[in-house]
């Protein structure tokens, strides 16, 4: 009996020793294979192509296979994979279904001269001017790889702009999701942003007439998003730097990274947008609606009127002017001094009064974008009629028939010399196209 007990104890002890040895061996093998896998991943990352910001005549022809360093835009997560590539493969098929063309990293690297043609810096990354192999000039936005929302915003822009087409929206041509980089390729807007024309001394001040035209263009773009798109889309970040101007000074709404379809997640945990343009109702309720875009558009209207940035006390001036608006002198006090008195005061008062409705604290009191388009259209039509009447001679039976009227020169239509022909062209075609909203 005693011998059997000793044998049992020896057997159990031997089993435990063997179990411990096997466990240690398994752990050692696991750590060995994991370390080997990390070395392989590290080697593959080192072969990634990165931009060389090199100046010189031959910089467009230089390609780099350099090792990724701390200054590279390619960031890696703790597990060794590129942050941008985490989960992207699961959605790549969805993006392809949008119909937007996919470009290779190497083609964009060459088109931007190794990313040396910087033309702007947005909230989500740098923007480069690029000349494609076809000769087409485009804008390439490289989304910042250290942005936690970057990939989500990339997905949003591709999916939305893949189905949204309107002459007052910036057209997305293609995208690139390769080598840890996410890039968006847009139609190149040669005149830059509205903000640059309002605040940069490099540009002549925009005439009042052109400012109203720009406001109408933006309103039409937003009207399409709210009422023409299916399902409707809320932009959520209307501001002067997100309004781009083409060669003919037609305004287009850009940057849809924060946009959402109206049917999806109206409630947001975090406040997103730009200070100065944010709807107070959205700030308090965390819920964004079409009327949130209307509020942002109202701020943009006052920005066009006053030539002042909302982050530099614009709305405080607006509230002070509104107190005196009943005496018909309030709104004149905030008009951009760069206009040098070249504006119709009655028109300014009408636009400003309507802009004030757009920023009402109560969303239900704000107009919708369709109402805004109609009001701005009427303002321009009335202006057009006034100009025609001003150019027409007063009938007088006592005088001989007046000589033929000489058409007013384009130079007298606006103080903006470089923009005169566009204003003249728009005025002449107003009767046939002012209410037309073509969807490309």
From Swiss-Prot:
Q: Which GO terms describe its biological process?
A: cold acclimation; response to cold
Q: What is this protein called?
A: Calcium/calmodulin-regulated receptor-like kinase 1
Regulation: induction = Differential expression between transcripts and proteins. Induced transiently by cold and hydrogen peroxide H(2)O(2) treatments despite stable transcript level (at protein level).
Q: What role does it play?
A: Required for cold tolerance, via the activation of MAP kinases activity. Phosphorylates and activates MEKK1 in response to cold in a calcium-dependent manner.
UniProt xrefs under PROSITE patterns: PROTEIN_KINASE_DOM, PROTEIN_KINASE_ST
Q: Where is this region: Calmodulin binding?
A: 28-228, 369-440
Q: Which organism is it from?
A: Arabidopsis thaliana (Mouse-ear cress)
Entry annotated with the keyword Transmembrane helix: yes
Q: Pfam families annotated for this entry?
A: PK_Tyr_Ser-Thr
Q: Which residues carry this modification: Phosphothreonine?
A: 274
Q: Which residues carry this modification: Phosphotyrosine?
A: 186, 282
Task: Describe activation and inhibition of this protein.
Answer: Kinase activity is stimulated by calcium/calmodulin, but blocked by chlorpromazine.
Q: What is the deletion mutant like?
A: Increased sensitivity to chilling and freezing temperatures, associated with a delayed induction of cold-responsive genes. Impaired MAP kinases activation in response to cold.
Q: Report domain Protein kinase positions.
A: 113-380
């Amino acid at each position: 009996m005693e011998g059997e007990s000793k044998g049992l104890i020896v057997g159990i002890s031997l089993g435990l020793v063997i179990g411990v040895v096997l466990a240690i061996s398994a752990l050692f093998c696991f750590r060995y294979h994991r370390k080997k896998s990390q070395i392989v991943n590290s080697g593959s990352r080192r072969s990634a192509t990165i931009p060389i910001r090199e100046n010189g005549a031959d910089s467009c022809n230089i390609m780099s296979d350099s090792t990724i360093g701390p200054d590279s835009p390619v960031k890696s997560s703790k597990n060794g994979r590129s942050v941008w590539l985490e989960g992207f493969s699961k959605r790549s098929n969805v993006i392809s279904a949008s119909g937007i063309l996919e470009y290779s990293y190497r083609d964009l690297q060459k088109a931007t001269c190794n990313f040396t043609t910087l033309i702007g810096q947005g909230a989500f990354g740098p923007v480069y001017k690029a000349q494609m192999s076809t000769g087409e000039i485009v804008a390439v936005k490289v989304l910042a790889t250290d942005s936690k929302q970057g990939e989500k915003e990339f997905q949003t822009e591709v999916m939305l702009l893949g189905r949204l087409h309107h002459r007052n929206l910036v057209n997305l041509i293609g995208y690139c999701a390769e080598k840890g980089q996410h890039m968006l390729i847009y139609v190149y807007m040669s005149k830059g942003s509205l903000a640059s024309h309002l605040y940069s001394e490099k540009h002549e001040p925009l005439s009042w007439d052109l400012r109203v035209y720009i406001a109408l263009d933006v309103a039409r773009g937003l009207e399409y998003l709210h009422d023409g798109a299916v399902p409707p889309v809320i932009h959520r970040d209307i501001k002067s730097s997100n309004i781009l101007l083409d060669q003919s000074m037609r305004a287009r709404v850009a940057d849809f990274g924060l946009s959402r379809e109206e049917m999806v997640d109206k409630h947001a945990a975090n406040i997103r947008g730009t200070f100065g343009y944010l709807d107070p109702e959205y700030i308090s309720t965390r819920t964004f609606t079409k009327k949130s875009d209307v509020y942002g558009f109202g701020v943009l209207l006052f920005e066009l009127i006053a030539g002042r940035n909302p982050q530099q006390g614009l709305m405080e001036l607006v509230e002070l002017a509104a107190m005196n608006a009943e005496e018909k002198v309030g709104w004149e006090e905030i008009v951009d001094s760069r206009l040098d008195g070249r504006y119709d005061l009655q028109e300014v008062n009408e636009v400003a009064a309507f802009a004030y409705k757009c920023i009402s604290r109560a969303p239900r009191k704000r107009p919708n974008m369709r109402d805004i388009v109609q009001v701005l259209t009427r303002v321009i039509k009335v202006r057009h009629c006034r100009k025609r009447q001003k150019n027409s001679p007063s009938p007088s039976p006592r005088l001989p028939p007046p000589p033929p009227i000489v058409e007013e020169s384009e130079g007298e239509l606006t103080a903006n010399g470089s923009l005169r022909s566009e204003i003249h062209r728009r005025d002449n075609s107003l009767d046939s196209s002012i209410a037309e909203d073509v969807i490309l």
